[in-house]
């Protein structure tokens, strides 16, 4: 039995071994086939890799680079290739050992089985990589488009803007569209190029980075071509825009892209071009530059950044970098002239670069003197300035109408860096005939609208105040160049304001001129005989040394429309003014005239007569005004007050009265001065005039206890400026009971002077809806007034002046102020001036502080011990305090570490 059992076991072992040998031989056969398949597959994968690498290298020459997806695929191929190479080495080593002894076969069989499984895994990976390669080939091209690095000139002074833009382009920022705007030549393209290069050199999170250089002629079809070319797309020239848009959309929809559009002139419908609109889900961005903030709005820019002019320091650095010759600028005389040239550029980079290059080889002081003189008088003649002007002309030509272009050119009549009152500017435009009343449209509002267009086009800037505008130096030079037919007819304009002239230009220089502006000089005399057949505009205002106008001065100015003699020292008007039969606008405000000549009535087309602040004006004959049937504006604020002094003598003309004004059918704006209570009572009787009163000065109305302002001024709806002086019995102003929340809605300036019995300003409380347009309040010599708490929530109040009010104890009464800090307190206040307020204890209750005040002037207010500002940890937007040094040093400090905080800037006065 043992023998049989042993035999059975032995047979079973032999049979089992035979079966294992057969299985091992099968594995060996499968492994060899798998190795062959692996070698073929890896070879094919290498070929695909080599083709892709070649394409990347070729596209790299065009400024393109490998996409993140392609880069990951190439990395995976390299890993797979390494694994394959190692496995093939192991297989070949095993093949060399196949002749070894039989006892190793079982071991080899096990190892071959494991090796076969690894081969299968690698083959599977290779298959997946091949599938991914197909997706990469059709995914907007095998490589993704990027901007190539753009060579740019040195960048000066835009570091802060760079940081702002890069922050916007960061992953955390959800807003998708940024509009960068500013005037031509200010550096928008340079900023965009710097951003482009920064992203390329330091890396970014976008799959696709596309730069498109726009122009005025670019349409949506052209944008499609530019974007399509950058994406590597191709299409037939006859293919429709819709099909092209679809291709672009398919190429971009799964990508995170950044589209950079430089110099956009017209609104672009991104979706119509096929570019997906950026949103917080796709995290894409579109950034564009333009010269118009209006276009930023039309394009849906969620973030708008204005590229500002360079500060003086950076402007000097840029200019010097173009001159190159440091030794040249070390000469004090040449440096002084260079600084004049730089100042004329007004921080405009293009002008600085152009003029710096033009002066680089000028070594003598005489050359620099000549350059500064030419730049002052005829800047277009400076080398390179024609290029600067050509760039600005694009913006000029792009204005929507000839009306806008005329209004723009008119702004050049004022001095460099001069802030122009918007309302005054619009009044000139009306006088010139640019604006006319039609269909009930208010011409002043229309003028504001046009100024908004010019500001949006970056051709005008906001002035020193919100109510003002100004024109950049270089833009002004360009405007004068355009006004003279691009320098061809210089004799058409004689514009020399603020030049320091003591003599007027010679008579022959006036003959061909259409426009003459000699304002703000020191001219003492004018030519005796002038023939100006084409002259339409003459500005002589602010020549304080001018005391007389020659008798026949106006005889030969037959088409003159605008004449401004304001703030000269003239004492009389020559009778030759009667020849100005085309005159529309006449300003003699601030002059020393005492009589209006009767001949003024001959100016039948006159619409605007400004005589405000002519305090010496005593006589206005009826015939000087009554014949002016087209008169719309008559301003006698702080002026003539002889309303009830009509004379009927044989040798004396009857004087102007209130009744005469009612016959001026076109009158819309009236400025009135009243110097007696009787006159004030008389004015109350002429109800038809009340709606026209916009400027009112009341003085010396003694026995007037309460001033019923609403009854006099049509509930105050149109009153814009109110001045009350030396009405010693006045206690307060009466406000309408039936207009609790809507009285004096147009009032902008309030002046109260020498009202010794005034205990409060208004008869009832002031809500936020009242006085909603008041900008400036001046109160002086009102010795019974305790506070001005009513001013605290006026939404547009910018300036408060309190002078010599002996009993004022606080600006805001403690019991009339909110119990906690209120952000609506003084929401717009910028300037506070106080002087000679001996009882003033505090400017604000201790729990409050000014948030937006920029200037505080305190003189002789000894009881004030604390500034109404919070200490700040940064120097940004610190207010300036003008005060006595002794008072400044005595200020109370609440915290022992206050010296670590930034206090307001101190300026001794």
UniProtKB/Swiss-Prot annotation:
What result is annotated for mutating residue 412 to V? In 205C; abolishes disease resistance to AvrRpt2
Q: Impact of changing residue 276 to L on the protein?
A: In 204C; abolishes disease resistance to AvrRpt2
Mutating residue 419 to P: what's the consequence?
In strain: cv. BG-4, cv. KNO2, cv. Po-1, cv. Wu-0 and cv. Zu-0
Question: Principal localization?
Answer: cytoplasm
> What GO molecular function annotations does the UniProt record carry, in alphabetical order?
ADP binding; ATP binding; ATP hydrolysis activity
GO BP annotations of the record are: defense response; defense response to bacterium; detection of bacterium; plant-type hypersensitive response
InterPro entries, alphabetized = AAA+_ATPase (IPR003593), Apaf_helical (IPR042197), LRR_dom_sf (IPR032675), LRR_R13L4/SHOC2-like (IPR055414), NB-ARC (IPR002182), P-loop_NTPase (IPR027417), Plant_NBS-LRR (IPR050905), WH-like_DNA-bd_sf (IPR036388)
Compartments (UniProt record):
Cytoplasm; Cell membrane
Q: What is the effect of changing residue 104 to C?
A: In strain: cv. BG-4, cv. KNO2, cv. Po-1, cv. Wu-0 and cv. Zu-0
Cite the effect that the entry attributes to residue 545 to Y.
Answer: In strain: cv. BG-4, cv. KNO2, cv. Po-1, cv. Wu-0 and cv. Zu-0
What does the UniProt entry list as the effect of changing residue 558 to L?
Answer: In 210C; abolishes disease resistance to AvrRpt2
Q: Effect of altering residue 190 to S?
A: In R2M4b; no effect. In R2M4c; abolishes disease resistance to AvrRpt2. Does not display a dominant negative effect
The UniProt-reported impact of residue 597 to S is: In 211C; abolishes disease resistance to AvrRpt2
Outcome reported for the amino acid change (mutating residue 644 to G): In strain: cv. BG-4, KNO2, cv. Po-1, cv. Wu-0 and cv. Zu-0
Repeat (LRR) residue spans along the chain: 512-533, 534-556, 559-580, 582-604, 605-627
As recorded in UniProt, coiled-coil segments are 29-58
**Highest taxon listed in the record's lineage:** Eukaryota
Q: Which family does it belong to?
A: Belongs to the disease resistance NB-LRR family.
Q: What is known of its domains?
A: The LRR repeats probably act as specificity determinant of pathogen recognition. The coiled coil domain is essential for the resistance to AvrRpt2; the cultivars that do not display resistance showing specific variations in this region.
Subunit structure comment from the entry: Interacts indirectly with RIN4. Found in a complex with AvrRpt2 and AvrB. Interacts with MORC1/CRT1. Binds to NRP1. Interacts with TRAF1B.
Please describe what this protein does.
Answer: Disease resistance (R) protein that specifically recognizes the AvrRpt2 type III effector avirulence protein from Pseudomonas syringae. Resistance proteins guard the plant against pathogens that contain an appropriate avirulence protein via an indirect interaction with this avirulence protein. That triggers a defense system including the hypersensitive response, which restricts the pathogen growth. Acts via its interaction with RIN4, and probably triggers the plant resistance when RIN4 is degraded by AvrRpt2.
Q: What is this protein called?
A: Disease resistance protein RPS2
């Amino acid at each position: 039995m043992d023998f049989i059992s042993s035999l059975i076991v032995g047979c079973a072992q032999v049979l089992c071994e035979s079966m294992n040998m057969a299985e091992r031989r099968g594995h060996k056969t499968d492994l060899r086939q798998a190795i062959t398949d692996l070698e073929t597959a890896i070879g094919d994968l290498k070929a695909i890799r080599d083709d892709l690498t070649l394409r990347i290298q070729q596209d790299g020459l065009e400024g393109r680079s490998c996409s993140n997806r392609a880069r990951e695929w190439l990395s995976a191929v390299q890993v797979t290739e390494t694994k394959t190479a190692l496995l093939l080495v192991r297989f070949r080593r095993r093949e060399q050992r196949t002749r070894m002894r039989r006892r190793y076969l079982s071991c080899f069989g096990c190892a071959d089985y494991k090796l076969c499984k690894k081969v299968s895994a690698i083959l599977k990976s290779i298959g997946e990589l091949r599938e991914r390669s197909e997706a990469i080939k059709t995914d907007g091209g095998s490589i993704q488009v990027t901007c190539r690095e753009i060579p740019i000139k040195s960048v000066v002074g835009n570091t802060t803007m760079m940081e702002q833009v890069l922050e916007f382009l960061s992953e955390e920022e959800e807003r998708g569209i940024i509009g960068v705007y500013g005037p031509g030549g200010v550096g928008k393209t340079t900023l965009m190029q710097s951003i482009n290069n920064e992203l390329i050199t330091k890396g970014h999170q976008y799959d696709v980075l596309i730069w498109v250089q726009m122009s005025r002629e670019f349409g949506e079809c052209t944008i499609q071509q530019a974007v399509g070319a950058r994406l590597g797309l191709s299409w037939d020239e006859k293919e429709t825009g819709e099909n092209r848009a679809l291709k672009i959309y398919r190429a971009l929809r799964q990508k995170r892209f950044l589209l950079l559009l430089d110099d956009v002139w017209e609104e672009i419908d991104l979706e119509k071009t096929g570019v997906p609109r950026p949103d917080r889900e796709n995290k894409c961005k579109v950034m564009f530059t333009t010269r118009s903030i209006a276009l930023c709005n039309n394009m849906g820019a969620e973030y708008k950044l204005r590229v500002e002019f360079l500060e003086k320091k950076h402007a000097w650095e840029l200019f010097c970098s173009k001159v190159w010759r440091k030794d040249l600028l070390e000469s004090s005389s040449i440096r002084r002239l260079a600084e004049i040239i730089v100042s004329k550029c007004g921080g405009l980079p293009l002008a600085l670069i152009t003029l710096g290059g033009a002066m680089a080889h000028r070594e003598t002081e005489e050359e620099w003197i000549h350059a500064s003189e030419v730049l002052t008088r005829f800047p277009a003649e400076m080398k390179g300035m024609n290029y600067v002007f050509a760039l600005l002309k694009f913006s000029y030509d792009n204005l929507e109408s000839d009306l806008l272009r005329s209004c723009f050119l008119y702004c050049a009549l004022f001095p460099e860096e001069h802030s122009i009152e918007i309302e005054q500017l619009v009044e000139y435009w009306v006088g010139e005939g640019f604006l006319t009343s039609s269909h009930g449209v208010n011409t002043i509002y229309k003028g504001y609208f046009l100024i908004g267009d010019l500001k949006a086009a970056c051709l005008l800037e906001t002035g020193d105040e919100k109510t003002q505008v100004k024109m950049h130096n270089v833009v002004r030079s360009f405007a004068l160049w355009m006004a003279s037919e691009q320098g061809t007819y210089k004799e058409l304009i004689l514009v020399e304001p603020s030049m320091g002239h003591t003599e007027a230009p010679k008579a022959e220089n006036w003959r061909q001129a259409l426009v003459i502006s000699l304002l703000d000089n020191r001219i003492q005399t004018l030519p005796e005989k002038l023939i100006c057949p084409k002259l339409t505009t003459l500005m002589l205002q602010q020549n304080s040394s001018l005391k007389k106008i020659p008798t026949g001065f106006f005889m030969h100015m037959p088409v003159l429309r605008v004449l401004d003699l304001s703030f000269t020292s003239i004492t009389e008007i020559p009778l030759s003014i009667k020849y100005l039969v085309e005159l529309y606008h006449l300003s003699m405000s601030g002059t020393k005239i005492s009589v209006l000549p009767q001949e003024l009535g001959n100016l039948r087309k006159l619409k605007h007569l400004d005589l405000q602040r002519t305090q010496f004006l005593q006589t206005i004959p009826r015939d000087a005004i009554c014949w002016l049937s087209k008169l719309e504006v008559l301003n006698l604020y702080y002026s003539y007050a002889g309303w009830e002094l009509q004379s009927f003598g044989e040798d004396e003309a009857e004087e102007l009265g209130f009744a005469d004004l009612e016959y001026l059918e076109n009158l819309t704006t009236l400025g009135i001065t009243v110097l007696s209570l009787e006159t004030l009572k008389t004015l109350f009787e002429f109800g038809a005039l009340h709606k026209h009163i916009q400027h009112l000065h009341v003085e010396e109305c003694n026995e007037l206890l309460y001033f019923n302002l609403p009854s006099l001024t049509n509930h105050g709806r149109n009153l814009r400026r109110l001045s009350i002086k030396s009405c010693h019995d006045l206690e307060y102003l009466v406000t309408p009971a039936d207009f609790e929340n809507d009285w004096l809605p147009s009032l902008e300036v309030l002046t109260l002077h020498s009202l010794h019995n005034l205990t409060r300003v208004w008869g009832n409380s002031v809500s936020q809806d009242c006085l909603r347009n008041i900008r400036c309040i001046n109160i002086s010599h009102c010795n019974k007034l305790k506070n001005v708490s009513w001013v605290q929530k006026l939404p547009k109040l910018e300036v408060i002046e309190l002078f010599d009010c002996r009993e004022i104890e606080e600006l805001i009464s403690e019991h009339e102020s909110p119990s906690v800090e209120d952000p609506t307190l003084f929401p717009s206040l910028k300037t506070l001036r106080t002087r000679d307020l001996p009882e003033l204890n505090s400017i604000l209750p201790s729990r409050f502080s000014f948030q937006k005040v920029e200037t505080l002037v305190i003189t002789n207010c000894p009881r004030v011990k604390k500034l109404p500002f919070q200490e700040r940890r940064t120097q940004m937007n610190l207010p300036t305090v003008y005060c006595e040094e002794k008072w400044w040093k005595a200020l109370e400090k609440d915290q022992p570490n206050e010296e670590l905080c930034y206090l307001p800037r101190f300026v001794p006065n």
